[in-house]
Amino acid sequence: MITLTERQSLILKAIVRDYTEGGNPVGSKSLVQELPIKVSSATIRNEMARLEDLGLIVKTHLSSGRIPSIKGYRYYVDHILKPEKVDGKDLKVIQHSLGGEFHKIDEIVAQSADILSQLTSYTTFTLRPELKDSRLSGFRLVPLGNHQVMAILVTNNGDVENQTFTIPSDITGDELEPVVRFIDDQLVGLPLQDVLRQLTHEIPLKLAQYLQDPDGFLDIFGSVLSKAASERFYVGGKLNLFNYTDQQSPKELQSLYSLLDQTDRLANVIGPPGQRIQVRIGNEITNDLLKNYSLITATYDVDQHGQGVIALLGPTAMPYSRMIGLMGAFQRELARKLLDYYRYFDE
């Protein structure tokens, strides 16, 4: 385990700060003016050599200065960093943007990704709270003509999912009415995950009492139910990611952009809700496409309604102190807004 002296920590902190703010390698002469302690340029050079031996900073080919390594960023985040207090203007932007009127949780969560992206200029992700508390509160089939129906599913927290389907020509509206009544009588009030589990066995057996071949209806009901129960990732600032891709080939860039549209792969990258703000740097992210990036994730808690995740993806040379402070403030404001929303439905 690496242990730095106070002076070495101050030098590493200054190198990280200068490089993330200016993007240029940092030399000993500039550090002489910046450090809060009086020390000679020669002493700083010696300490920088020690930091380089430890693998915390590296020399570039274009300059005599040094830049932080992935290992250096990791040490800085774990042992030196103190989150900045969020700027008052940024806090007002968050509160104002989340202070509007929203009709669905997804609208709040989607808006959050856009707000966070605008504040950071990075690519951001928001995952809505877990759906363990979501229950089925209603289901309807609306005939549209030409053997088409719209399936509408409503949950207890106000979410509405709808999809249009073509039903087999041998199934009539009269045959579907008792099926919808069965769902209202037997399934309304159950958690969505319980209803999904019953789709594999119990529900098909019971629907066979009403339909000769229930498969067509099961496809309809299962599709809209799965959509309502699925994880929802929202992405803000997709194009921001390409501001930090100098070392990647066109093929890698295409794969990277494609990744942002794949919920399952995003879920693996971002991970489940945790206990605190987490920072993963370079190879710590479970996807080779993101080896030159850093990912900051924060879990927000909405009491019995579960937990969600906010995340931002940017270059390894990001201002971690400001970003972590901002994520903490955003985490609190989003949780407060969602608690207000849930309180309305709980009443």
Swiss-Prot record:
Gene Ontology biological process: negative regulation of DNA-templated transcription
Pfam families: HrcA, HrcA_DNA-bdg
Entry's transmembrane regions: none
Gene Ontology terms, MF aspect: DNA binding
Entry keyword set: Repressor, Stress response, Transcription, Transcription regulation
Signal peptide (from-to): none
Top-level taxon in the UniProt lineage: Bacteria
Family to which this protein belongs: Belongs to the HrcA family.
Described purpose of this protein according to its UniProt entry: Negative regulator of class I heat shock genes (grpE-dnaK-dnaJ and groELS operons). Prevents heat-shock induction of these operons.
NCBIfam families linked to this entry: hrcA
Protein name: Heat-inducible transcription repressor HrcA
Species of the source: Lactiplantibacillus plantarum (strain ATCC BAA-793 / NCIMB 8826 / WCFS1) (Lactobacillus plantarum)
Taxonomic path: Bacteria, Bacillati, Bacillota, Bacilli, Lactobacillales
Originating gene: hrcA
